[in-house]
């Protein structure tokens, strides 16, 4: 096939621009050009290969077959010709979890540099043209030897905008995410591609988007946004059991059935399809409201909301942190819970008098005489959603503690039967918003209903409007608090730039805006404002939190979705519940819609439809009935055509008279405010607050708002019937009968002389008031009078809403229900006029005023062509007077409204006169202090009107009977003067109105939202969305269920766009700068040295990585398409250029000086490098806080898993404290100015591990000398191996430093931690160990002068005695060995002492030679020289002389343990009741003085193993066995407990800390280091603790290191268990949904006084039986209670908590922890969630890595190992045993009997020790006699195995309690 040439236009034939395939196809083949065309496409033969067999690269291209003039940076596209692709169904797709839906047009894009990198492969296959991996071929339908088309494409067309990466079974930090993305930059990726980062992070490429379209491959540039999704997250599923959950949906399905049979199964199906490995928690929650009469029956945490309702919140945990739960059982439990939930929380059991009921009767499900139903489950709207969110966030506040290395992310899904609208507390909403945004956590809200017509999610709360004086005070207070902890400020002006600020809506809001001149430019968000005037009534606001993703799951099985199907949205539950035949015969009571009446303040029809010469009518002011004569007065003088037109318009207007004209959005409403219309922005109250003479109305529901009566009766008359006032909202839900009764009441108030009139229909053409539009009418009538009592104000209750954007703060939506105040306006008219005077004056006044006002126009009006009539109508001051009049009633709604009626004798002239006076007397808003005084007589003329407003008498005010009418000239003169003053005041206010508009319109846009018409350019919401904006590759479909978010939750994006302006930073943020100097010698353990990286660049990268790890985001440049307020608009190019971080972090770009910006909710960090000073400058901007950040205390009832019922839980919700992080110290630590030491304030990620003896026997092992080792010896070797692993992992800066240090071994001991501190020998060893570490450098210098080769034995012995080798008396299992040293110490000493000993292996060889030469010997002569805890001593000829040892110092101080008298399969138990080793039947010999042999039974399975080998007779050869006791144990237990007195406590450090390198293979480009804290002492029978703390190290390296240690230790019979750091008693403080299970004892243990004398002296008698019981079930000591330590010693641990209230045990399998309470309280049980959650993931991973792991796991199961799934079985078994009194009694008796045997054996051993010490026997004879007596005392116990003649029987006091045979007999 010949190459094809692309013929294109002349403008596209240059080398720099290549034509694509589509251009070639659409171009004309006949076009020509003088230049030679560029070849951009050619056919090519495609091969496939399987990496890494032929090549490690996925694409290999032969350059000879590529396109000409191909550059390495070019992009190539590989496609198959049409018709040659394999069928889609036959394409063997890859893994199901990343299957990509490739179409037939899918193309594969790759870089030329990627394809031509493997030259060796091309050289071996010269005929190769192009080859792709089989994975690519399968995904794209390619096949071997296929003919393909290779095309050159441009980067612009294939640059990826968003790419998704999926990962599972690993914890991926944000720093690792950024590094993964950096590795992908400047490469091409495809869907399904596997991505790795230095072998640590493994991810899979998911969806790829280019220009919001999904593609299969593309090019990753610096502007590409990466989306990281986790398939193994901590998943919380909350199900709200509100009242609606038991209701029926329209399709007849109950909502909880829809959840159980629809949503949850679908979610599980999608989980399995991925597949995911989430750790799941399922919680049911509800709120129950109680009446006040029911409070006395409740005992729970009763709370009261803002409305005074009493309630209790309930939570029940169904699934608790399970990774592989049985979903069949879970679904069954959920179904049962829906039936039992109400029963559990609504039925209250109460005691009654009479005899006690039987046990069965008390546990009956329903006892009519003993239970009472109380409370009602709340609706979803009133539920406890925010409380549940905060309870779930409490564990996440300390997410860095107990870090799960296999989980990433937190996902919360809330399932509700509501519509997404919730009534919440303001402070709780604020703290929830801050915590959600600070933690970078999202939430999915799934509603089972249809989507409502308003925006969701929607939170309704109450708040005060900011007061100007309070704003200034809060600003000052914020600056004073700038040095302290600062939260997300709501300072003035910060409403625009608050990321995380919800969009808000207010009703009744205009009255809360204070004077403009004293208010800051941008008042704070009401959500972030706390008023200091709590007496004021709060307004209603709405918030749309953008941290909630709302979905609607409303699938109907019988009605599949169709786009053309009508879906009803208004739910009428009574109608839905009707039967089919009930529609015509059933009555339904539907409340009336609360609408705002059409009055003169808001009427548009009265002005839109009237001609200019038509004056205002009085028809809106007289009461009903009215006669035709009065009705036709307004039509006098008009032509019949005009009369008919007005009549039609009256009718139309009457139809819509109840509907506010603001219901429809008006884009010019904003312009009206600029021209003087106040509306919500230009509130009359704002102006009137500055007006002298105004006084506050004390009876108003809104305490600080002047009560006004606007428009007199015109604005107060109820719609529908002009004479019938509308009652308050609480009284408006009347039937027709109620309305008629109200009408009759109105008629009764009329004058008796009024002629009767029939009832008028509702829609009468004569009902419409032809009044002058109120737009030009002044509002000076608001001025109140204090001379007369006021009438009752009208009532107002509304659900008013306000538009954002189109109508700033104007009432829309549901209108107000207004009830007029009595006597309005009637008394204002003191004169009567004739009709002609009224008509002329009214028309003239209307035209003049309207013209004067409409002439004041905004420049924006000029652009609105075709709307001049609308502008002219709306340019007056309507809105202000409308708002004023609408708010003139009683806001409490508690006062009734007296209906207003007009006396029948009132004439039309009087009514129109009143209207004219009202219009002329109060049109302007005098807010300026320099105001022209009112015209004389103006106030007097309107005094009657003003007095009406303040009148308190409910009776109508009578008009004076004798009043002389004034002349027409006087009337016109007065009207002209009033109009002149009106126009003058209007002009004065215009400038002020425009200024107000500029700020308040902006505020309204940014803080208020209309749920029914939300704005798309809300800045407050945009700044919050910017934190998550890069997570959305394209516009979301609000109708679709967000399954991807609920299946694979996304992590917080790494980049954001939000950056405040310079002025905002100066005004609303506090600055905290610091500088870090950089030099060429900069060195830190957090920096990896590299010759190619400048030190400043390395420090800068680490600073950025550590901030990313703490939740910060890079601030990146915004694209031109970004509409929101972003960094593109806020960066000043004069100072710097905001660039992509990946560009700035590259070599060569550091010297530009451009800063890197990183931000979190309340902080912004600006990091830049100053080349002139060689310093990195950091500026931290912390947002000021103007609101209270006090924590919120909360109480509720929670039913944790495995507990019998609800428990009262107290929780505290705390604001995030990101400002307290010590960034200055961290930056100094990165730069190397601070030593590497652990600092708690840096919030290290941390995890704890416990090393315990495993349940099975370790694999058989032989010493290098050939002898077999017993279980304890093997485990001691394992602990030494762990010390060696720690030594190898330590961080060293040089090779010499690594060679000079020696392995620091642990101090083995057979005592418990508390008892070891009373052992002088142990304390001496501890001091020597610390001294050895300090003197290590000095020993290294001495080493240079000595060699062991050719050195005489005498010289070596002198070196041993004086050269640093520890030779002293040692205790093991309560037996003293004098003048001994261990093999491990000997090896370490030789490595340090002699220069020719370079390794421990060489030291072992030299030790064997020295032992063979007779320098030293084993204490029992049973072992050769071994590197471990084996006791040796110099032979007598080399031992030298030592002073008296004081053998009698411990003769009577301590007794040994007792011998077990039963089977050999009993575990070894020491003086405190503990045993060492594992369950093996073999007899254990000495491991250098360890006179130990034991046999542990499997705790749960109860199996018994027999001994297969014997070490009998080892101790009979011992030559120097001294039975003595440590001097520190001479005091009694009472002494121990009371020691210390007033003495100063001695500090003892029982742990060691070091820095380890978890990347020994140097795979990472960073310094992967961590802090390791481990115990110093180790008892093989107890748990050994160590913790790992790290900052921004890749967690995968830490996990790999721990897993490597685990596999190594398993060969020595040891198990490494991941454990929680704190004690299990306090787990509820960290996670409120978790609680330990209490296991009580049915029979208390014997009193310590009964067995104290029989215990070995120095042994604590407390909890002896509890310890023995736990060890019987396979538990080992993890942490000992702090109270058991000596009082005169202050212990310090860095490897474990310093304080434990109760002793804590861990099971050998690692599945559970138990704390000992003591007495009848028994124990606390808690499953080990950390260990159990890893079982499934680790087993899958290790089976994949090493097939031997599966075989080993199978062997452990055959040996009876307890798996994680059996934790509950073990708990139930322990519970059964503790609840059986007979079993406990038998157990106690056996323990007491063994104590008697202990006392007998101890007396024999003490006597023998005394005789030997006195020198009665010779050494050999004494040893033989001792061996003989020991063998005799154990003959009974040896009968079962015959292998324990060498064991001191006193060491096995309670071993018989753990045998498998006894466990079976007990069962």
Swiss-Prot record:
- Supply the PROSITE patterns for this chain: DEP
Q: Which GO terms describe its cellular component?
A: GATOR1 complex; vacuolar membrane
| Keywords, sorted A to Z | Membrane, Vacuole
* One annotated GO biological process: intracellular signal transduction
Q: Where is composition skewed (Polar residues) in this entry?
A: 1-14, 902-927, 1471-1482
Q: Which GO terms describe its molecular function?
A: GTPase activator activity
* Protein localization: Vacuole membrane
One of its Pfam families is IML1
Stretches for region Disordered: 1-48, 469-532, 681-765, 878-969, 1459-1488, 1500-1551, 1736-1761, 1819-1867
InterPro entries listed in its UniProt record: DEP_dom, DEPDC5_CTD, IML1, IML1_N, WH-like_DNA-bd_sf, WH_DNA-bd_sf
Q: Where is the composition biased (Low complexity)?
A: 503-515, 705-719, 1501-1511, 1518-1529, 1750-1759, 1833-1844
Q: Specify the superkingdom.
A: Eukaryota
Q: How does it sit in the membrane?
A: Peripheral membrane protein
The record's section on PANTHER family has: DEP DOMAIN CONTAINING PROTEIN 5, GATOR COMPLEX PROTEIN DEPDC5
The record's family statement is: Belongs to the IML1 family.
Q: Could you identify this protein by its name? A: Vacuolar membrane-associated protein IML1
């Amino acid at each position: 096939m010949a190459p094809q040439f692309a013929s294109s236009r002349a403008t596209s034939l240059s080398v720099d621009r290549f034509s694509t395939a589509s251009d070639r196809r659409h171009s004309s083949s006949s076009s020509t050009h003088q230049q030679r065309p560029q070849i951009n496409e050619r056919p090519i033969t495609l091969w496939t290969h399987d990496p890494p067999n032929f090549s490690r690269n996925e694409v290999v291209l032969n350059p000879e077959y590529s396109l000409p003039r191909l550059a390495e940076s070019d992009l190539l596209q590989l496609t198959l010709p049409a018709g040659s692709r394999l069928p889609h169904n036959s394409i063997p797709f890859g893994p199901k979890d990343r299957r990509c839906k490739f179409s037939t047009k899918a193309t594969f894009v790759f870089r030329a540099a990627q394809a031509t990198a493997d030259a060796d492969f091309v050289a071996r296959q010269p005929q190769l043209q192009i080859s792709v991996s089989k994975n690519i071929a399968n995904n794209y339908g390619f096949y071997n030897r296929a003919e393909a088309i290779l095309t050159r494409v441009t980067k612009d067309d294939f640059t990826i905008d968003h790419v998704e990466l999926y990962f599972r079974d690993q914890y991926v930090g944000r720093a690792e995410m950024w590094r993964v993305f950096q590795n992908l930059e400047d490469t091409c990726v495809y869907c399904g591609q596997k991505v790795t980062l230095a072998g640590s992070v493994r991810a899979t490429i998911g969806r790829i988007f280019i220009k919001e379209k999904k593609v299969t491959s593309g090019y990753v540039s610096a502007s590409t946004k990466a989306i990281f999704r986790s398939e193994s997250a901590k998943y919380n599923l909350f199900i709200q059991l509100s009242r609606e959950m038991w209701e029926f949906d329209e399709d007849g399905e109950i909502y909880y059935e829809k959840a159980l049979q629809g949503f949850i199964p679908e979610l599980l199906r999608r989980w399995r399809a991925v597949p995911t490995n989430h750790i799941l928690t399922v919680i049911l929650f509800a709120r129950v409201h109680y009446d006040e009469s029911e409070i006395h029956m409740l005992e729970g945490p009763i709370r009261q909301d803002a409305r005074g309702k009493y309630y209790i919140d309930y939570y029940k945990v169904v699934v608790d942190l399970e990774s592989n739960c049985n979903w069949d059982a879970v679904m069954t439990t959920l179904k049962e819970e829906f039936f039992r939930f109400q029963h559990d929380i609504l039925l209250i059991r109460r005691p009654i008098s009479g005899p006690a009921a039987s046990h069965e009767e008390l546990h009956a499900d329903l006892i009519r005489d003993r239970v009472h139903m109380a409370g009602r489950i709340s609706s979803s709207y009133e539920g406890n959603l925010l409380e549940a969110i905060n309870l779930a966030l409490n564990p996440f506040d300390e997410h860095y503690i107990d870090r799960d290395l296999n989980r990433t992310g937190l996902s919360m899904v809330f399932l509700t039967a509501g519509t997404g609208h919730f009534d919440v507390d303001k402070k709780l909403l604020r703290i929830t918003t801050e915590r959600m945004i600070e933690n970078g956590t999202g939430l999915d809200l799934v509603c089972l209903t249809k989507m409502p017509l308003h925006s969701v999610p929607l939170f309704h709360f109450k708040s005060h409007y900011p007061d100007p004086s309070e704003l200034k005070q809060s600003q000052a207070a914020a600056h004073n608090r700038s040095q302290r902890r600062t939260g997300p400020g709501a300072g003035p002006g910060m409403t625009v730039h608050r990321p995380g600020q919800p969009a808000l809506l207010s009703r009744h809001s205009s009255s809360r805006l204070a004077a403009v001149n004293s208010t800051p430019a941008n008042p704070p968000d009401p959500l972030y404002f706390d008023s200091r005037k709590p007496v004021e009534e709060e307004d209603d606001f709405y918030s749309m939190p953008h941290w909630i993703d709302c979905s609607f799951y409303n699938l109907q099985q019988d009605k599949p979705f169709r786009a053309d199907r009508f879906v009803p949205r208004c739910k009428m539950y009574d109608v839905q519940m009707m039967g089919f035949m009930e529609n015509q015969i059933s009555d339904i009571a539907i409340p009336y819609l609360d609408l705002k009446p059409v009055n003169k303040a808001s009427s548009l029809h009265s002005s839109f439809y009237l001609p200019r010469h038509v004056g205002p009518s009085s028809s809106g002011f007289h009461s009903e009935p009215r006669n035709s004569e009065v009705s036709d007065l307004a039509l006098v003088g008009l032509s019949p055509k005009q009369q008919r037109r007005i009549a039609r318009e009256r009718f139309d207007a009457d139809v819509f008279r109840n509907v506010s004209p603001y219901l429809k959005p008006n884009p010019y409403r904003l312009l009206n405010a600029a021209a003087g219309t106040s509306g919500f922005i230009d509130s009359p109250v704002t102006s009137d607050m500055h007006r002298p003479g105004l006084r506050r109305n004390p009876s108003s529901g809104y305490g600080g708002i002047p009560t006004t009566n606007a428009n007199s009766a015109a604005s107060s008359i109820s719609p529908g019937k002009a004479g019938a006032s509308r009652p308050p909202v609480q009284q408006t839900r009347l039937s027709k009968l109620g309305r008629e009764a109200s009408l009759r009441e109105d008629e009764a108030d009329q004058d008796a002389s009024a002629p009767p009139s029939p009832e008028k229909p509702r829609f009468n053409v004569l009902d419409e008031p032809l009044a002058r539009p109120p737009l030009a009418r002044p509002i000076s009538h608001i001025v109140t009078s204090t001379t007369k009592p006021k009438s009752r104000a009208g009532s107002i209750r509304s659900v008013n809403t306000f538009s954002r954007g189109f109508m700033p703060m104007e009432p829309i939506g549901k209108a107000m229900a207004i009830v007029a105040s009595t006597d309005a306006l009637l008394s204002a008219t003191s004169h009567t006029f004739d009709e002609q005077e009224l008509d002329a004056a009214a028309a003239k006044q209307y035209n003049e005023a309207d013209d004067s006002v409409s002439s004041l126009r905004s420049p924006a009006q000029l652009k609105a062509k075709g709307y001049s009539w609308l502008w002219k109508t709306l340019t007056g001051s309507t809105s202000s007077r409308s708002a004023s009049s609408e708010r003139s009633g009683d806001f409490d709604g508690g006062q009734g409204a007296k209906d207003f009626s007009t006396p029948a004798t009132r004439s039309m002239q009087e009514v129109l006169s009143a209207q004219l006076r009202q219009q002329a007397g109060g049109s302007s808003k005098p807010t300026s202090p320099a105001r022209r005084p009112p015209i004389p007589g103006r106030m007097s003329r309107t005094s009657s009107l003003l007095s009406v407003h303040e009148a308190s008498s409910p009776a109508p005010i009578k008009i004076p009977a004798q009043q002389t009418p004034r002349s027409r000239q006087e009337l016109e003169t007065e009207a002209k003067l009033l109009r002149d003053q009106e126009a003058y005041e209007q002009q004065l206010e215009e400038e002020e109105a425009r200024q107000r508009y500029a700020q308040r319109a902006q505020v309204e846009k940014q803080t208020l939202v209309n749920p029914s018409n939300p704005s798309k350019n809300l800045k407050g919401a945009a700044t919050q969305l910017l934190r998550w904006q890069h997570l959305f590759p394209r516009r979301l479909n609000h109708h679709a269920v967000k399954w991807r978010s609920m299946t694979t939750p996304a992590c917080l994006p790494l980049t954001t766009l939000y950056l405040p302006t310079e002025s905002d930073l100066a005004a609303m943020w506090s600055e905290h700068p610091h500088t870090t100097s950089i030099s060429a010698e900069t060195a830190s353990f957090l920096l990896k040295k590299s010759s190619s990286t400048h030190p400043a660049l390395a420090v800068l990268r680490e600073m950025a990585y550590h901030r990313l790890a703490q939740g910060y985001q890079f601030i990146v440049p915004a694209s031109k398409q970004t509409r929101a307020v972003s960094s593109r608009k806020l960066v000043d190019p004069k100072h710097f250029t905001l660039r992509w971080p990946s560009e700035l972090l590259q070599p060569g770009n550091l010297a530009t000086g451009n800063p890197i910006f990183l931000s979190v909710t309340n902080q912004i960090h600006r990091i830049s490098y100053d080349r002139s000073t060689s310093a990195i400058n950091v500026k931290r901007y912390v947002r000021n806080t103007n609101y209270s950040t006090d924590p919120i205390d909360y109480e509720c009832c929670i039913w944790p898993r495995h507990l019998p019922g609800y428990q009262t839980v107290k929780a505290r919700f705390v604001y995030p404290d990101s400002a307290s992080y010590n960034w200055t110290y961290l930056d100094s630590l990165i730069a190397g100015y601070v030593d590497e030491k652990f600092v708690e304030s840096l919030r290290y990620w941390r995890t704890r591990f416990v090393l315990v003896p495993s349940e099975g026997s370790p694999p058989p092992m032989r010493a290098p000398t050939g002898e077999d080792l017993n279980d304890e010896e093997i485990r001691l070797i394992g602990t030494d191996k762990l010390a060696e692993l720690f030594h190898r992992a330590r961080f060293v800066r040089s090779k010499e430093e690594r060679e000079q240090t020696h392995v620091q071994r642990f101090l083995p001991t057979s005592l418990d931690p508390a008892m070891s501190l009373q052992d002088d020998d142990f304390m001496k060893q501890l001091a020597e160990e610390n001294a050895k570490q300090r003197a290590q450098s000095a020993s290294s210098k001495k080493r240079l002068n000595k060699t062991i080769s050719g050195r005489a034995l005498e010289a070596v012995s002198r070196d041993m005695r004086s050269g640093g080798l520890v030779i002293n008396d040692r205790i093991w299992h309560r037996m003293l060995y004098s003048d001994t040293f261990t093999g491990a110490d000997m090896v370490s000493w030789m490595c340090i002492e002699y220069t020719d000993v370079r390794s421990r292996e060489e030291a072992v060889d030299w030790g064997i030679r020295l032992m063979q030469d007779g320098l030293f010997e084993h204490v029992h002569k049973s072992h050769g020289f071994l590197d471990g805890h084996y006791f040796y001593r110099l032979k007598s000829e080399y031992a030298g002389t030592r002073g008296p040892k004081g053998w009698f110092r411990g003769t009577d101080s301590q007794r040994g343990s007792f011998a077990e008298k039963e089977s050999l399969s009993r575990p070894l138990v020491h003086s405190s009741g503990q045993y060492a080793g594992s369950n093996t039947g073999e007899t254990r010999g000495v491991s250098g003085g360890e006179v130990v042999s034991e046999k542990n039974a499997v705790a749960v399975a109860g199996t018994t193993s027999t001994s297969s080998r014997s070490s009998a007779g080892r101790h009979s050869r011992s030559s120097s066995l001294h039975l003595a006791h440590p001097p520190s144990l001479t005091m009694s237990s009472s002494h121990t407990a009371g020691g210390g007195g007033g003495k100063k406590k001695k500090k003892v450090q029982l742990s060691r800390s070091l820095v380890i390198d978890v990347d020994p293979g140097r795979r990472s480009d960073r310094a992967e280091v961590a802090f390791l804290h481990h115990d110093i002492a180790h008892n093989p029978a107890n748990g050994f603790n160590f913790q790992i703390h790290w900052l921004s190290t890749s967690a995968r390296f830490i996990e790999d290191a721990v897993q490597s240690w685990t596999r190594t230790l398993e060969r020595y019979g040891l198990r490494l268990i991941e454990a929680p750091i704190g004690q299990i008693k306090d787990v509820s403080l960290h996670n409120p949904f978790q609680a330990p299970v209490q296991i009580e004892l049915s029979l208390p243990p014997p009193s310590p006084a009964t067995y104290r004398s029989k215990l070995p002296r120095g042994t604590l008698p407390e909890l002896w039986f509890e310890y023995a019981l736990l060890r019987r079930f396979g538990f080992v000591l993890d942490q000992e209670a702090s109270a058991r330590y000596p009082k005169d010693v202050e212990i310090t641990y860095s490897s474990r908590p310093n304080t434990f209230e109760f002793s804590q045990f861990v099971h050998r399998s690692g599945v559970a922890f138990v704390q000992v309470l003591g007495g009848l309280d028994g124990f606390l049980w808690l499953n080990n969630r950390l260990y159990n959650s890893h079982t499934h993931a680790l087993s899958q991973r290790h089976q994949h890595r090493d097939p031997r792991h599966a075989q080993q796991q199978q062997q452990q199961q055959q040996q009876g190992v307890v798996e994680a799934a059996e934790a509950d079985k073990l708990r139930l078994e322990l519970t059964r045993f503790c609840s059986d009194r007979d079993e406990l009694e038998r157990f106690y008796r056996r323990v007491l009997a063994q104590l008697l045997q202990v006392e007998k054996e101890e007396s024999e051993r003490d006597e023998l020790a005394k005789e030997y010490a006195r020198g009665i026997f010779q050494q050999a004879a004494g040893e033989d006699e001792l061996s003989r007596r020991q063998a005799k005392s154990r003959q009974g116990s040896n009968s079962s195995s015959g292998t324990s003649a060498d064991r001191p029987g006193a060491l096995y006091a309670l071993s018989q309690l753990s045998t498998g045979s006894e466990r079976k007999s007990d069962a």
